[in-house]
Amino acid sequence: MELKERNFKKIGLICVAVLLCGMVFSYGIFPSILRFMIKQNVLLKPGTQIRDMFEKIPFPLDFKLHIFNVTNPDEIMRGGKPRVNDIGPLYFEEWKEKYDTVDNVEEDTLTFTLRNTWIFRPDLSALTGEEIVTIPHPLIMGVLLMVQRDREAMMPLVKKGVNILFDPLESAFLKVRIMDLLFDGIYVDCSSQDFAAKALCSGMDSEGAVMPHNETHYKFSFFGMRNHTEAGRWVVYRGVKNIRDLGRVVSYNEETEMDIWDGDECNQYIGTDSTIFPPFLTAQDRLWAWSPEICRSLGAHYVHKSKYAGLPMSYFELDFGDLKNEPHNHCFCRDAPDDCPPKGTMDLSPCLGGPIIGSKPHFYGADPKLVEAVDGLAPNKAAHDVYIHFELASICWFTGSPVSAAKRLQFSMELGPIRDHELFGQLPDVILPMFWAEEGASLNKTWTNQLKYQLFLGLKFNATVKWLTIIIGTVGAVGSAYMYFRKETKTTDVAPVDVSTPDTNPSSAKDGVVNVSLGRNLPPVIDGLDKPPKLRATELQQERY
């Protein structure tokens, strides 16, 4: 009996030790090892895999363009409601390359020049690029609307310049071949010696709206000037000294902050360049990225858990918000709070130099009035929302980038009448979509398998160890404790006692008395317990007298 109790005690102690060791390994040792391995893999130090992938992504991003073809331009010129048709997409491969890199060990920064290259893939496109579309004229209307809004005193000079450069001036809309609009370029004749024409050409050149073609002509396109050319000089943190700073933008073109918006807070570089993010983020953190195309940072917020390629992920979405009701963002307004862009949109005119409004495609998530003002729009979450799939434990520790993402942005013109202009005086006040772009990537099996085998199998192993030790340790400890403290209870049968009649020999009853607690018969006579004998009636009578 003593030996069994000692064995139960040993087993219980062993189970408690297993439980404690499992908890220490699962919640202490393994996370520390994993964190150390992640840090070593995501730092932007020379010679690491992540550095090589950061400098040149080994696969192209998906870049898709949709054009909003205006189907009733003449009606709009008379003040009618616009009607558009979303056509596309045109599919391009987008290659990002960072070159001329310089490491600063003391500052823990990496300096590089970014170059974007787009390659058209007609085999993956719904259009050939040869189609003719109609859109608001980006140069004519862009110049007139901006000058009327910000420099009205110059309107007579600008009107004269527009009449010369775009003679004959017949419409506020441009009919153009799609590929000319996007990349090949539209010719602008600046050969006139008239002062107004030369001043207008000089202004468009200085603003970067057009690109010189020869001594007398310029070209305008949405992306041609940026294709396979320098996209700025960047400085970002490498994350060696502080892993939370990994990829964070320090400066752009030697400027540590912008000088675009009316407020210091809006002019800050917040986040990364969107190709890498720091690890160890939580659901409470936003995924911030700064984009020079829109001169501001945007932060995606956590929505719910998700799956990608069978792997558990976290789903993030981007919301443009409502600037009018966000005091900390009033510096993005022209004159807050009365003159802010509608809900779900951004005023990009300070950044792009034209009356351009940014939003999600088809004004998804924006003020419903914007959709109602234009026929042909059909907002759809699956096709038009901005999303990112992340693995929050490490943010894809082998690449430091999202496993699947789609960044979608629509560019619209803030159209309106030109005062005292016989041709453009009846244009409606409307935000008219021109085109929208989708930039995204989804990792294939080659990359998701790396994530699966290098990270998730380790996490599964840790989870298995944790739960096995918890179950075995807890059950074993409780069971051993129960067996150790359990005492055997033995029960003896109690014999029935005969009740004697007065005529029965008293000794016979006494012989049957049982000591229940000791399990042994008591002696037949116990001093002090025998009853006195009964007196006969004659003896009782004599005793009285």
From Swiss-Prot:
Compartment(s) = Cell membrane
- The residue ranges for the Extracellular side of the membrane come to 32-464
Membrane topology per record: Multi-pass membrane protein
Which Pfam families has this protein been placed in?
CD36
One GO BP: sensory perception of smell
Mind telling me which GO cellular component terms the entry cites?
membrane; plasma membrane
Ordered alphabetically, the record's keywords are: Cell membrane, Disulfide bond, Glycoprotein, Membrane, Olfaction, Receptor, Sensory transduction, Transmembrane, Transmembrane helix
Q: Which residues cross the membrane?
A: 11-31, 465-485
Question: Which InterPro entries does this chain map to?
Answer: CD36_fam
Q: Which cysteines are joined by disulfide bonds?
A: 266-331, 295-351, 333-340
Instruction: Name the job this protein performs.
Output: Plays an olfactory role that is not restricted to pheromone sensitivity.
Q: Which family does it belong to?
A: Belongs to the CD36 family.
Q: What is this protein called?
A: Sensory neuron membrane protein 1
